[in-house]
Amino acid sequence: MTTVTPGLRLRFLGFFGPQKPPATVTFGTGLNVIYGASNTGKSFIVEAIDFMLGGKPPLRDIPERVGYDLVLLGLETLDGKSFTLWRSIDGGGFRLYEDLHQTPPTNEIPYTQLDEKHSDKNNTNLSSFLLDLCSLGGCHERCNSDPHPTPEIRSRG
């Protein structure tokens, strides 16, 4: 029997635009520290990670963001499976690609469309995907000692 190690780690965060050079942050295994002088983008990186994990748009408008139109986030499970999330900088749904794509995948590469909002009736959404990676898909939280059904766990929305 194969055991699954639940959990995931970030591998990279990248911004892409038609007339702009890629702006990418790469994450290593273990603890990553984002540091630097004031007004160098540290908080924006954290906000962008939140945005790519289902945070509501819009992503904060900063001058350095002008010209970029899409964001990629590379994820890896603790078992070594890799995925790339694609999202418009304006928000909306996600594209889920297998493997890590450090540049925007071409139209020939297959992907799964994921909704931005959680739904217990349809599991093709980002929240369900992330919860499944952590072995929490379909779980419900226990709010109190009431034996009646409880709300479904969701990562966002």
Sequence positions of predicted segments:
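A generic secondary-structure signal marking the coil-to-beta-strand transition
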Residues: 30, 156-157
